Amino acid sequence: MATTLRDILDKLLGRQPASAKTARERLQLVLAHDRSDLSPELLDQMRREIFEVVAKYVEIDLEEGEVSLETEDRMTALVANLPIKRSQAKAVSSQENGASSQEAVSSQESVSTPGAME
């Protein structure tokens, strides 16, 4: 389901897609679901989990993100289109540093001092 120049112009000019084209896209989606043997519930669960995993590393636009099944040349693919707002690499590394320093503090507290147990 590649986007063509005509599709882009239709969107910009507010034109509605032809009913035959819409019906064809719906049929392709139904065929993709049938061939993959994935229920809509399972696909929705996969979508949520994919969003959660990706959100650990980058901030994504949940409203614009989508996960879909696409069929081309008798091959079905799971396609995730997730617009990235910004990277969270700094947040991840600072969380790791925070955990390391917390572990260091905990290990220092557990070290017994001479005379403390007497």
From Swiss-Prot:
The gene is minE. The keyword Cell division applies. Prevents the cell division inhibition by proteins MinC and MinD at internal division sites while permitting inhibition at polar sites. This ensures cell division at the proper site by restricting the formation of a division septum at the midpoint of the long axis of the cell. Coiled coil: none annotated. This is Cell division topological specificity factor. Disulfide bonds: none annotated. Gene3D superfamilies: Cell division topological specificity factor MinE. GO terms for biological process: cell division; regulation of division septum assembly. Residues 99-112 have a biased composition (Low complexity). InterPro entries: MinE, MinE_sf. Keywords: Cell cycle, Cell division. Residues 86-118 are annotated as: Disordered. Belongs to the MinE family.
